[in-house]
UniProtKB/Swiss-Prot annotation:
GO terms for cellular component: cytosol; small ribosomal subunit. The keyword Oxidoreductase does not apply. Part of the 30S ribosomal subunit. Forms a loose heterodimer with protein S19. Forms two bridges to the 50S subunit in the 70S ribosome. GO terms for biological process: translation. Located at the top of the head of the 30S subunit, it contacts several helices of the 16S rRNA. In the 70S ribosome it contacts the 23S rRNA (bridge B1a) and protein L5 of the 50S subunit (bridge B1b), connecting the 2 subunits; these bridges are implicated in subunit movement. Contacts the tRNAs in the A and P-sites. PROSITE patterns: RIBOSOMAL_S13_1, RIBOSOMAL_S13_2. Residues 92-121 are annotated as: Disordered. NCBIfam families: uS13_bact. SUPFAM superfamilies: S13-like H2TH domain. It comes from Oceanobacillus iheyensis (strain DSM 14371 / CIP 107618 / JCM 11309 / KCTC 3954 / HTE831). Belongs to the universal ribosomal protein uS13 family. This is Small ribosomal subunit protein uS13.
Length: 121
């Protein structure tokens, strides 16, 4: 396995797919990285030379990935909570942040249902 940005990427997959195993690198970013490094997208990771791996590593280092990106996202959320914005309040309460309805669904953010005792008629 080749190590790029502290992540072991799979050897048997194409390079463009293997790069998506790095947090913060999707398919489009992976294509841009390979274009900058001058490596074909169809190449398998096991067929890469050390020179090509080095160029890919340099290209990936220009992007905000892995721990730095996770830290940035968590600090952004913490900042929203501290300034008391609407989005920060939604984060604090564990509710959807982007305007979704919450009457029926939003189970991912709310967690499992908490059943209430039956109301007497």
């Amino acid at each position: 396995m080749a190590r790029i940005a502290g992540i072991d990427i799979p050897r048997d997959k194409r390079v463009v797919i293997s790069l998506t195993y790095i947090y913060g690198v999707g398919k489009t970013t992976a294509q841009q990285i390979l274009k900058e490094a001058g490596v074909s997208e169809d190449t398998r990771v096991r067929d890469l030379t050390e020179d090509e791996l080095g160029r890919i590593r340099q290209a990936v280092d220009q992007y905000n990935t892995e721990g730095d990106l996770r830290r940035e996202v968590s600090l952004n959320i913490k900042r929203l909570i501290e300034i008391g914005s609407y989005r920060g309040i939604r984060h604090r309460r564990g509710l959807p942040v982007r305007g979704q309805k919450t009457k029926n669904n939003s189970r991912t953010r709310k967690g499992p249902r908490k059943t209430m005792a039956n109301k007497k008629k």
